């Protein structure tokens, strides 16, 4: 009897999620339309923070999903800056990208914060030292990247994008600069990716009608 009941509950759960996602529940419109980098593709942006444990847990799942994306979908990460103490890790993200070590150190910096607990995500001096050590690059070169002329513009854009998205937390996925979903809205990490797939398919259908 217990086995039958468990089977029924699992079936019910799968059927309840199989229904079409609801606007305002599982996903929502962005507060403002956010311009995308690539007009020819459907852009998916992950808004995240290296200091966020939920982003850390989401990262390997998201990575597997990104590998399977069709050619008409473009994925990128953008650091979220809803408050000043998130800025040091955003600065690290852009500096590592400029130095060409972004992909190499992406998982490592997450691990340093959450697994090893050897890096304070709000301590800019410690973060700069970590990037210098792990990249093997000259400290002056790393400092120049952290304080480059374009850095403030990148940080301002990231902060503006987070506000325009209407996101209230991270990780949040923004699709086509017009829709957002998250594990909180969708009911889990895998579910948020299913919602993202749903939105991507609808955006594709709308584009094909034009």
Where are these regions (language model features)?
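A short structural micro-motif
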Residues: 14, 112-115, 148-152
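Alpha-helix N-cap/helix-start motif
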Residues: 55, 85-86, 120, 155, ...
């Amino acid at each position: 009897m217990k086995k039958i009941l468990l089977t029924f509950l699992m079936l019910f759960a799968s059927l309840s999620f199989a229904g079409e996602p609801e606007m305002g529940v599982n996903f929502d419109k962005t507060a403002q339309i956010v311009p995308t980098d690539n007009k020819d593709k459907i852009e998916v942006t992950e808004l995240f923070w290296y200091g966020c444990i939920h982003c850390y847990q989401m990262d390997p799942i998201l990575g597997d999903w990104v590998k399977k994306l069709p050619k008409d979908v473009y994925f990128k990460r953008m650091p979220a800056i809803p408050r000043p103490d998130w800025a040091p890790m955003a600065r690290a993200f852009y500096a590592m990208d400029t130095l060409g070590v972004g992909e190499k150190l992406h998982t490592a910096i997450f691990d340093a914060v959450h697994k090893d607990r050897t890096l304070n995500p709000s301590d800019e001096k410690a973060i700069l030292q970590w990037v210098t050590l792990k990249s093997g690059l000259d400290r002056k070169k790393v400092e120049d990247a952290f304080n480059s002329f374009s850095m403030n513009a990148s940080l301002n854009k990231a902060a503006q994008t987070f506000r325009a998205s209407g996101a209230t937390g991270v990780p949040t996925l923004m699709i086509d600069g017009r829709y957002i979903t998250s594990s909180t809205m969708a009911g889990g990490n895998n579910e948020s990716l299913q919602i993202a797939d749903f939105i991507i398919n609808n955006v594709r259908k709308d584009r094909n009608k034009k």
